[in-house]
Structure formats: C-alpha cells, structure tokens
C-alpha cells in the first residue's frame, strides 16, 4: 500500500468515526479529549495537563471543554489541596458516552486492514 492509499484509508477511518461520533453528540476531537480525561480516572485532570495530553493550548482546551460541560459530559472537580487548581472529570453521562463511542471506534478498527491498524496504533504512542 503506497503512502497516498494509506493516507486515504486513514482519512476514511477518521471520517467514519467522526460521522458516528456526531450521532452520539460528540466529535472525534471531543472523543480524544474525553479519552485523555478518562485515562486520569476519578480524580480528573488539570486543564494544563489535558492540554499537554491532547496537544492543544490551555485556551484551546478551555474552548473545547465548554460544549462538553454545557451538555453535561464533563464536570469541574474541586482540588482538595489547592482551591486555585481546577480539574475536570467525566460525568456519569460523559463516561457512558465515552464507552459507547469507544465501542464504536473498536468496531471500526476491526473493519480496517491490519496494516492500517498498525499505523493507527503507532500514531497513538
């Protein structure tokens, strides 16, 4: 498979995830943010750490979180040791949405070639 074919298959994969994600009410970018939050567990994650995890600026993360907060998928968590620190975590409905989209992504992964799976997995390391 040449580079152009790989790129087109990757783009089709992401477009498919994006379309299905929109059915659930979250874009692929929002899914990536939710994934980073989910990986931190119930303690949540500081916005600055979330920005590092998803390669956005802190203000970019703040803008991306706004619709997720408005829809009730993400909630602000208080920091026990320092009131100035703000963390965000997934709400129960956000965790359920994340699970639904994750299963959908896994289903899509099973439909792409093994070569594309290896490429996708290498991009997440």
Residue ranges, per PLM feature:
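N-terminal leader segment of winged-helix/HTH proteins
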Residues: 1-24, 71-73
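A cross-family signal for key residues in well-ordered alpha-helices
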Residues: 8, 32-35, 99
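N-terminal helix-turn-helix DNA-binding core of bacterial DNA-binding proteins
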Residues: 15-57
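Short, hydrophobic-biased segments on the C-terminal half of alpha helices
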Residues: 47, 65-66
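Charged, amphipathic alpha-helical coiled-coil/dimerization segments
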Residues: 66-124
């Amino acid at each position: 498979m040449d580079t152009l074919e790989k790129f087109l298959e990757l783009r089709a994969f992401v477009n498919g995830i994006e379309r299905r994600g929109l059915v659930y009410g979250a874009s692929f970018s929002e899914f990536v943010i939710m994934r980073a939050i989910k990986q931190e567990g119930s303690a949540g994650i500081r916005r600055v750490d979330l920005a590092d995890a998803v390669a956005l600026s802190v203000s970019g993360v703040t803008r991306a979180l706004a619709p997720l907060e408005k829809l009730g998928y993400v909630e602000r968590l208080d920091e026990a040791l320092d009131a100035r620190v703000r963390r965000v975590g997934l709400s129960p409905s956000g965790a359920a949405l994340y699970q639904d989209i994750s299963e959908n992504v896994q289903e899509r992964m099973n439909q792409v070639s093994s070569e594309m799976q290896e490429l996708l997995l290498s991009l997440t390391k």
